[in-house]
């Protein structure tokens, strides 16, 4: 078991390739800031065909500026639902499938609701109750 930490790394300035790793990773955990995970997932999906991915979905970086409120907070549940449905549809275009989807048990730094998505290349026909996941969001204290 080996863990490589990429905190403080600007993924926009880095080209990620399977050749960079020996052995090739089979798992990635993503918690990125100030960037949509849509900019990172295609590289992971292409370069690491057997990789499982757990990604933190942050609606404030996925919804688009027009749907993000004051101070970068997304409060509208409809926007959360749109973001999650859109993300579920998007990952399929990359050959990835959502195997688990849930609300994060902690809020983002500024109080944003965030969600955890477990992705694999293994096909599944799971359907997630996105509306319920959003509406029943609770934070553990």
Question: For the regions a protein language model found, what residue spans apply to each?
Answer:
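A short acidic, Gly/Pro-enriched loop at the edge of an enzyme's catalytic core
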Residues: 17-27
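Class I S-adenosyl-L-methionine
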Residues: 87-122
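Short, glycine-/aromatic-enriched active-site segment of Class I SAM-dependent methyltransferases
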Residues: 59-76
